[in-house]
């Protein structure tokens, strides 16, 4: 008897070629539902509609098509269990040897502007996941394909193994099937959580899933295997970036690129550039042009910039490209790259050059693994509002000082705590990152700034527990400080600022970064 394949897909890419090979090369019979059956029929292929095979018509406007014992019995039957075979024979059910199914485009639907809840709900597949899970469960006896990218590999398996896919292939396909349904259900749960958020006090379940995008050479270190996963079915963020040149991206490249993106997303109105090393900015600056912004960022700490990750919020032009080629860089990302600039950058073929049109959109949550679970928090994407800042010293800020304070505050937000940033002329002069005491970070930032600290601004991501940081800053020539406040000894720091003639502004918002 000919083997039986069930084909029911929303994405019909490659389905005709697959079906033709199944029929002509391997003597499969085909059963199919809805639009897939029509597509096969239009292509001149012999196909039996699911409704004709089961004897039950599609009902509820197509909501029930494949949910039938003749379908699921054929999928779930164990060929090495006599009672299962007897049950099939008694109910005139043929065993199904191949299931090809992909799911309604739920994520694509909810991504459309103005889509209603009713429209979204109608794109929640029921029969598809049921078949996908059933066939994945029974991998010992049949194969399941849920992605057109699997079709050629499956056919090659049949050609090399006398018409039967290997157990290894079936196991991999089953794992992909379960991963696909998990990701699909996660997308639905997240979408409905957002939809129903007004009366959900909290989310009791949090599911994290993704599709493997790329195996990375290694993780942070060569002994750590690593993989890059994409969330959702539609590429977004770095999965949507275009690599114009250079080697494959590494784990550390991607981590640093994301750190660079977060900083550059703070600045939209003015050309901005940042250079990242080990997720911290060694130089960030604004300029009248993107070329000027990059040069200022580079000169802020040219030593640390070597081997850095550069992010720009404007297209790369020829002038900027020429500057970029003057030192060794790991990666450069910008919204786009002009043709002449690309020719210039090509002279440094090892530099990874990427374009990503949307550098401002990032994940809404951050997730960290801990022993026995993981932690989830909303992203620190609060927008700085200077109208809510409190000037706590006798000296009031000028408009220019307020703009500089805002720049320093935005950069400091993305430096590892304890974080101190010294700036002037919308350019970082010194960055103190990751120290175990705040005054230690102050000293590092001031040492980097050197003589340029005179007349500069200092930002701190957390409050000052003592007035020593204020006095150290004043001794180096700092004239204004922005910090969140909230210490029991705020009055000591404010008094020191007044005594030393400094301006101090409290934001009321802390930006720890661990």
Curated annotation (Swiss-Prot):
A Pfam family of this chain: MGS
Occurrences of domain MGS-like (ranges): 1-146
Query: Which keywords has UniProt assigned to this entry?
Result: Hydrolase, Multifunctional enzyme, Purine biosynthesis, Transferase
Which InterPro entries does this one have? AICAR_Tfase_dup_dom_sf (IPR024051), Cytidine_deaminase-like (IPR016193), MGS-like_dom (IPR011607), MGS-like_dom_sf (IPR036914), PurH-like (IPR002695)
Q: Which PROSITE patterns match?
A: MGS
- Pathway membership, UniProt: Purine metabolism; IMP biosynthesis via de novo pathway; 5-formamido-1-(5-phospho-D-ribosyl)imidazole-4-carboxamide from 5-amino-1-(5-phospho-D-ribosyl)imidazole-4-carboxamide (10-formyl THF route): step 1/1; Purine metabolism; IMP biosynthesis via de novo pathway; IMP from 5-formamido-1-(5-phospho-D-ribosyl)imidazole-4-carboxamide: step 1/1
Query: For this UniProt entry, what's an example GO CC term?
Result: cytosol
Instruction: Offer one example of a GO biological process linked to this entry.
Output: 'de novo' IMP biosynthetic process
Instruction: Enumerate the GO terms in the molecular function aspect.
Output: IMP cyclohydrolase activity; phosphoribosylaminoimidazolecarboxamide formyltransferase activity
Q: What is its EC number?
A: 2.1.2.3, 3.5.4.10
Which reactions is this enzyme annotated as catalysing?
(6R)-10-formyltetrahydrofolate + 5-amino-1-(5-phospho-beta-D-ribosyl)imidazole-4-carboxamide = 5-formamido-1-(5-phospho-D-ribosyl)imidazole-4-carboxamide + (6S)-5,6,7,8-tetrahydrofolate; IMP + H2O = 5-formamido-1-(5-phospho-D-ribosyl)imidazole-4-carboxamide
Print the domain comment field. Answer: The IMP cyclohydrolase activity resides in the N-terminal region.
Give the UniProt family note.
Belongs to the PurH family.
* PANTHER family, per database record: BIFUNCTIONAL PURINE BIOSYNTHESIS PROTEIN ATIC, BIFUNCTIONAL PURINE BIOSYNTHESIS PROTEIN PURH
Q: What is this protein called?
A: Bifunctional purine biosynthesis protein PurH
Q: Which organism encodes this protein?
A: Nostoc punctiforme (strain ATCC 29133 / PCC 73102)
The organism that produces this protein has a lineage beginning with:
Bacteria, Bacillati, Cyanobacteriota, Cyanophyceae, Nostocales
